[in-house]
């Protein structure tokens, strides 16, 4: 993932943690395909689901297309700035699908490099099924994550208009930004420092493609096909290794061969404003999933009134559970952790047996 870094908030939390049934379970409407759902407006999404899983995700795999959609969902939604609006300028439409509708403009933004093929594939799906691009991006994200063990089941609301304007430039925080710049940009969009850390759980499934081409698709943690806390643990390990022949853009030393470390991740893990939240994400896959789901529910309605949208979460499949406990990778110990939260002791996390890992590129 060449990243950029993706009603009341209480209502968002409640909605985000109430797991829906599904896919197609427990509803009162029977769709033409025989599926059961809560609302007739949701029926079209079963057809989109089959199309995405068969073609876009190449048989429901947790591979590169999932990582691309995680970039896209964040880059689309974060094009939202109340500060610009207050200054009398267009502040962006948020999660409106403008990255697809206005790809001729938005794909020229440096943060969106390498997304053209994925955007065009999504455009074809949206047109074929007659769904809005904003809805499609949110749906494809939830479906894609369901292919990755351990992922939370994301909320999916439909009803976004397909009318949008191009996002203003320079609204996507990037891996070379300092922490203050990231927190200021995310704060403008309505996210607290804690929520910034929560959203970075997406990096559990991430790899980089454009930051260091010599180590193409090098993962950001040792389990890039599993949604787990290893990303938070491993980003706190001392950087000792240069995984490629030279360091790439916004790259820091890594704890073992094959793993890529983004400068923004390393800084956020150690900054006084975010370090304690970061540390709290290391020891519980369940807590990480709950927090990510809540933050994604909030991001998915940037620019929209959630009460005007229809809940079709029951169409989203559930991911396979991940029962593996968090570990400090083999060859390392807790002494290799750069503890950065002064107010709380580092959690007790087991150390894996075996030698220091050496990671292959993510698929």
From Swiss-Prot:
EC number in record: 1.11.1.7
Signal sequence extent: 1-20
Cofactor: Ca(2+); heme b
Residues under site feature: Transition state stabilizer: 71
Residues the record lists as binding heme b: 203
Gene Ontology cellular component annotations, sorted alphabetically: extracellular region
Protein name in UniProt: Peroxidase
PANTHER family, per database record: CATALASE-PEROXIDASE (PTHR31356:SF66), THYLAKOID LUMENAL 29 KDA PROTEIN, CHLOROPLASTIC-RELATED (PTHR31356)
Active site positions, chain numbering: 75
Major site of localization recorded for this protein: secreted
Subcellular location(s) of the protein: Secreted
Residue numbers binding Ca(2+) 2: 204, 221, 223, 226, 228
Encoding gene (name): CIP1
GO biological process per UniProt: cellular response to oxidative stress; hydrogen peroxide catabolic process; response to reactive oxygen species
Disulfide pairings: 31-43, 42-312, 62-148, 276-341
One Gene Ontology term of the molecular function aspect: lactoperoxidase activity
Residues found modified as Pyrrolidone carboxylic acid: 21
Gene3D superfamilies membership: 1.10.520.10, Peroxidase, domain 2 (1.10.420.10)
Pfam families membership: peroxidase, Peroxidase_ext
Sites where the protein binds Ca(2+) 1: 76, 94, 96, 98
Top-level taxonomy: Eukaryota, Fungi, Dikarya, Basidiomycota, Agaricomycotina
Family under the similarity heading: Belongs to the peroxidase family. Ligninase subfamily.
Organism: Coprinopsis cinerea (strain Okayama-7 / 130 / ATCC MYA-4618 / FGSC 9003)
